[in-house]
UniProtKB/Swiss-Prot annotation:
It comes from the Eukaryota. It comes from Arabidopsis thaliana (Mouse-ear cress). Gibberellin-regulated protein that may function in hormonal controlled steps of development such as seed germination, flowering and seed maturation. Residues 1-22 form the signal peptide. The keyword Disulfide bond applies. It is found in: Secreted. Keywords: Disulfide bond, Gibberellin signaling pathway, Secreted, Signal. This is Gibberellin-regulated protein 12. Belongs to the GASA family.
Length: 106
């Protein structure tokens, strides 16, 4: 009898967690985007700080990331989606390089 109760409790917990995780996934999918995706000119200059704040949110070098991201955004009027990569979304942002040939924009 005790085994039956333990199996029932474990099954109930697994069933409950399955539904609670599904609700979280739905709410994440319906959340509004932090900034627009798109190519060059898809942002207005006043939208750059918020887009760069998100772009630089995962780096340990936050201050230089924000400086260069805002500089690039003000020139290109776009910031790639996500916190890393996706530079193909914004050719100007992707192709602007330093004198040494490295990427200027984070």
């Amino acid at each position: 009898m005790m085994k039956l109760i333990v199996v029932f409790v474990i099954s109930s917990l697994l069933f409950a967690t399955q539904f609670s995780n599904g609700d979280e996934l739905e709410s994440q999918a319906q959340a509004p985007a932090i900034h627009k995706n798109g190519g060059e000119g898809s942002l207005k200059p006043e939208e750059c700080p918020k887009a760069c704040e998100y772009r630089c949110s995962a780096t340990s070098h936050r201050k230089p990331c924000l400086f260069f991201c805002n500089k690039c955004c003000n020139k290109c009027l776009c910031v790639p989606s996500g916190t890393y990569g996706h530079k193909e979304e914004c050719p100007c942002y992707n192709n602007w390089t330093t004198k040494e040939g490295g990427p200027k924009c984070p």
